[in-house]
Amino acid sequence: VGSEMCIRDSYEFETISLPVLSEVGGDIQFIANTDDTAIGGMTMNTGVKQIDMNSLTRVDGTVFLTAFAELRTLPALNGVTVKGIELVNLGKLLDPLDFSGTTFSGGGRLLLTNMNLIETLTMPAQADVTLELRYNKLLNEVDGAEELAGLVYSPGTDCTFPTLRIVRGDVSFGLGQQVGVSTPSLERVEGNLLNDVKTIAYPKLTEVGGYLAVTDNVSNDSGSCDFRSLHKVGGQLYFDSTNIYAAIDMPELEEVGTAANPAYYKEGANDQYYKDAVYGSCALLSYDGLNFPKLRKVGGRGFTLDLGLGMANFTDLNLFALEEVEGIFQIHQNGPDMQPTAPLETIELPVIQKIGSVHIEGCGKLTDFSAFLPVIGQLNADTWFVHEDCGYSPTYEDMKAGHASKQ
């Protein structure tokens, strides 16, 4: 077939057989939408039980199979060269699903949506395809794949990707307040990495090329985040640990926001309470502290720390290796005159060499700003600001005169 092939409204058939079809220059579409049975707003075909394409070797486009309620086995796609495969509302397709012999030619996606009986998906080690898994009730393991073009996961259930090492594009684990994701072998994400699930585990992850975002869907279990090996985030590190009553722990992290054009999950004004609050390239909300003992450089728009509503146990900010912040260094509590005041008492930056600007608010117990004396000569009255609601609010002239702490 020189271009695409489309078969719709085939409700009168039990079998669709194309025994000599070998190559298709575009897409193959089997789309059923005529029967009265509906799932998720889509009408289902309850007649077709079998689709045969046993001679198929190559599809230059995507194979679409949509809304066949009684289809139990796939056409012979394991071994085909194809751009993409999209399987939607095939509620009786039997487990397991094996694409280990399929060659994905690039630029497409492997989409599974509402596949109610599939528990295990097996893929080739090198798969030039974006894998999208959406609302599959039982799917709990994706095996075989070592490298993907991209990955999107919407629960579903808990899922593990035991062999996955590299994703060349974006990864999104989304809308999963009750589920966990495990990627025990993942080493590198070249695009963005979004975490919006209950638990996440990246024990071998060393680098994220774009932004790394962790939302407040993450569990209050202190072990719900594992970034023990992470060295570099090229874009924004956005971490909302509202529900994590433990320090943000990244013991090997050295640099954030240092890509040539850093990607941001959130940017611009974070001004719900303070009109001058912003999202930096290292934008953190933490109740219980930071463990960044090796962080050397923050590029892009700078380092911003939100201390929440004053409910934190965060008393000491120690960034012992931090040398450079290209943009702003900002700390704020979520709202002026909030009670109790943020408990932050000390800031330690023993090797700091460069900061673009300083802006600190809402820290009623903070009375010593000596950490900034090594860089005060780089600043001026416009780039130095400490709000009067802090325990001590030295002006730029105070700092220039060496009056960095409350007497």
Question: Which stretches of residues belong to each language-model region?
Answer:
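Feature marks extracellular polysaccharide-active and adherence modules
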Residues: 8, 19, 31-33, 54, ...
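Acidic/polar low-complexity surface segments
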Residues: 31-43, 257-279, 333-339
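Short, T/G/N/S-enriched strand-turn elements that build extracellular solenoid repeat scaffolds
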Residues: 13-22, 47-57, 70-80, 93-104, ...
